[in-house]
Amino acid sequence: MKLTLQQLKVFATIARYGNLGLAANELCLSKGAVSQSLQELERQLSTPLFDRIHPRLQLNNEGRLLQPAAEELLTRMQDIENLFSPDAEPSGQLRLGASQTIGNYLLPTLLASSKQELGLPPKVTINNTHLLCHALANFELDMALIEGENHHPDLLAEPWLQDEMLVVAPPGHQLANKKELSLSRLGGETWVLREAQSGSREQFIQQIQPELPRWQPGLELNTLEAVMLAVEKGLGISFISRLAASDRLADGRLIALPLSRRFPRQLSLIWHKQKYHSTSLRHFIHFCRAQVNNAEVSRPE
């Protein structure tokens, strides 16, 4: 049996896209060449690696077993090539994921610093925590920065920065001048919330909703900016990250209602347990860890 790196590269690319045509475009090969390479790999291994569900190819048990080993080998090969590159700096494009609060309000500062110091040109995907974890589990991302909880057994989450969730309202809200509010006082309010499976929605369901004797769901929006603008316009109140709302709180477009309890939120670095850490990935993780005490990044109160 003589497997080739090209066969493994074709396999890994098909696994990411689930489609021969898309994989062929990514590899700059014909669809026929990609299909032939996969068939030869399956012949050599004496087992199919995908379930053919037209037009998609989904990894079967054998394919899922091969995927982390193939991804690791291909990444190690990239590291070997980098060892002999003229600049000897980390290279290769990292595939980073970020949930919306981090991606919109924290990651730009982080990437500006890491690009200058580390020379990393990452490809960034911004999505909700649930979808990012799904992508990590399928090796579609190298790592992610999330604010929600990880429920996937194949992923490893490392605590990173601290954020805080606030109940925000438009200026002049009837409860704004109260000294201390219990959650039960918010039961009759209309709530503007993020979509299901977002980190902030999950925290609302776990920590806020059970305390409300009654509550009125209002708009459901899939971006933080849309949620905050809706609150500004008087369409309801919301449960929002301090990190996301800081500018609007500072200039008075939003106010934080004075609750009797606080809602801290853990931000985390997360990756697949079987993910090989390339030089670039190791450098970026180290850089992220070094930002814990950086006031510009963590934005403490």
Residue ranges and their predicted role:
Residues 106, 255-297:
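A late-sequence structural motif
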Residues 42-59:
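A short LG(V/I)-centered, amphipathic sequence patch enriched
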Residues 154-191:
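Flexible hinge/capping segments at coil-to-helix
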Residues 91-153:
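Central regulatory/effector-binding core of bacterial HTH transcription factors
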Residues 12-30:
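Short helix-boundary/capping micro-motifs
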Residues 8, 44-45, 66-88:
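Alpha-helical linker/hinge and terminal dimerization helices associated
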Residues 189-211, 278-281, 285, 295-299:
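Secondary-structure junction motif
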Residues 128-133, 137-141, 146-147, 205-206, ...:
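Hydrophobic hinge/microswitch elements
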